[in-house]
UniProtKB/Swiss-Prot annotation:
GO terms for biological process: queuosine biosynthetic process; tRNA wobble guanine modification. Monomer. It comes from Bacillus velezensis (strain DSM 23117 / BGSC 10A6 / LMG 26770 / FZB42) (Bacillus amyloliquefaciens subsp. plantarum). Coiled coil: none annotated. It catalyses: 7-aminomethyl-7-carbaguanosine(34) in tRNA + S-adenosyl-L-methionine = epoxyqueuosine(34) in tRNA + adenine + L-methionine + 2 H(+). Pathway: tRNA modification; tRNA-queuosine biosynthesis. InterPro entries: QueA (IPR003699), QueA_dom1 (IPR042118), QueA_dom2 (IPR042119), QueA_sf (IPR036100). One of its GO terms (cellular component) is cytoplasm. Keywords: Cytoplasm, Queuosine biosynthesis, S-adenosyl-L-methionine, Transferase. Belongs to the QueA family. This is S-adenosylmethionine:tRNA ribosyltransferase-isomerase. Its main location: cytoplasm. One of its GO terms (molecular function) is S-adenosylmethionine:tRNA ribosyltransferase-isomerase activity.
Amino acid sequence: MKVDLFDFELPERLIAQVPLKERDASRLMVLDKQTGGLTDSSFKEIVSFFNEGDCLVLNNTRVLPARLFGTKEDTGAKVELLLLKQEENDTWETLVKPAKRVKKGTVLTFGDGRLTAVCTEELDHGGRKIEFRYDGIFYEVLESLGEMPLPPYIKEQLDDKERYQTVFSKEIGSAAAPTAGLHFTEEILDELKQKGVRIEFITLHVGLGTFRPVSADDVEEHNMHAEFYEMTEETAASLNEVRKAGGRIVSVGTTSTRTLETIAGEHDGEFTASSGWTSIFIYPGYEFKAIDGMITNFHLPKSSLIMLVSALAGREHVLSAYRHAVEEEYRFFSFGDAMLII
């Protein structure tokens, strides 16, 4: 299957550069996955599309302010560090710019010395293993010194860090927000609960590979990055109850979808408490084992994310919906509008 089959024309002006003032002010397109029928709505109306006994599954990961700007201790030369993955204790795999300035043994300082670091290993493609030194709690130091690692297509500065976090974010560890969750407010979650819709949480720490374009010509040749996920015993039991009672399981975002499909795929369609790393790649031809529907944003052309959405609703239906979104000037990508596939 050719990657070009998932291409579409997108005017640059439709790429949302800043979040809306109100989280739930975004628009909502509802796509019937069976017929391809479309309904233009608003996210404030999301509750009306759910029934008592349904279950919504959200990703409670919290984004690390993982961009650090510092200097080399010996020369004062400026460097930028992007935290990718915690290896052990205070050692992290990072991406350094410019990489040539940081060799094994190089010492870096951040925030007037509140945080220092030493390079312990040089990796490929600008990667470096870095060991940090600091007083206090690392994540608190990071919250005060770090900046959000916004996607490359967002050029504007983010005034409020919390607008790149969901209102239910809890488990620190993501390099990017699970953006479908950004539309939810506490009020909408309460309304859903009052209607008898279950709200459950999983954790998947989003890696920067989520922004990596599919470089292969053929879909099947693309290798997905691995991301850490976790599901508790309580959540697994709740989802199995919903399934048994005939309720619909609707995932919020591609991250929740990949977590649920990984777990159900490994346990004959059942949900069970588990944690690990997933590199599941979902594209047309995949048979879903966990979800009945999905809330997601509008994705990049030829991305693994639009392929996942196409696996659920059909490529023709999705591309038709995207053409409609362009005509109606929906906002695209991380800070853009939402789609409900049901």
